[in-house]
Regions:
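Buried hydrophobic packing segments
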Residues: 30-34, 51-52, 145, 149
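DPxDG-like acidic metal-binding loop motif
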Residues: 13-42
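Catalytic-loop motifs flanking and including active-site residues across diverse enzymes
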Residues: 26, 30, 95, 141-145
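Active-site catalytic microenvironments for nucleophilic, acid-base chemistry
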Residues: 37, 54, 80, 148-155
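Single conserved hydrophobic/aromatic residue that forms the stacking wall/gate
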Residues: 1-11
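Surface "functional belts" at beta-alpha junctions
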Residues: 41-140, 194-197
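Acyltransferase
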Residues: 133-198
Length: 198
């Protein structure tokens, strides 16, 4: 239509992980290509930050959990200080049972959000301090991710699309298997294996 812009957006933001390795690569690659082609700013937001902001306010500790397969979850801890959401512990990968035991020993109320609660829920049945969040909080919402990106946008701290990479937290199974296969051949191993998305 004459006079109308085909792509009327001026800013892009996307979750940068952790999560599915393939999903992160596809999503990140798409966002980077769009930002580069349209010459607009691109902001990356940790998936955990968006999940935590699904809960508008609570005095409880928020534990975001994303399924990491093989009985593990990606987890991060948050708490509100007034209206400000603060990261209490940066994302890490841990066995679900170990995470529950650790939080139970703190004797404080914790609410879990994210798709990883399917691994947590059976471990916290009838626990009055470890609470499974409402199902509506299990998936990151665009509005919650935008709230997390807002300070970056206000400060103009966008990323160079060519330099932005996903937050994997741990190496992929393919990298682990490659290292195991070539452990006797140092020339085949990289000191810091990475995946570049362009």
């Amino acid at each position: 239509t004459p006079g109308r812009t085909l792509f009327p957006y001026t800013t892009l933001f996307r979750s940068s992980g952790p999560g599915s390795f393939t999903g992160l690569r596809i999503g990140m690659g798409t966002a980077k290509a769009m930002a580069y082609a349209l010459q607009i700013p691109l902001y990356g937001v940790m998936t955990m930050d968006g999940l935590a902001r699904n809960i508008p306010y609570t005095t409880d500790t928020i534990c975001t959990v994303i399924d990491a397969q093989k009985k593990h979850v990606y987890a991060a801890l948050y708490a509100y200080d007034g209206e400000r959401l603060q990261v209490k512990e940066e994302p890490f990968v841990v066995e679900a049972a170990s995470l529950v035991e650790r939080l139970r020993n703190q004797h404080k109320r914790v609410v879990f959000v994210g798709d990883g609660i399917k691994r947590i829920a059976p471990l916290v049945e009838d626990d009055e301090l470890l609470i499974i969040g409402d199902p509506i909080y299990r998936i990151p919402k665009a509005s919650s991710l935008l709230l997390s990106a807002r300070p970056l946008i206000e400060r103009g701290e966008s990323a160079d699309p060519m330099d932005m990479v996903p937050h994997y937290i741990r190496r992929s199974e393919a990298e682990v298997l490659w290292e195991e296969k070539h452990k006797d051949n140092p020339a085949m191993l990289k000191e810091n294996p990475t995946v570049t998305v362009i």
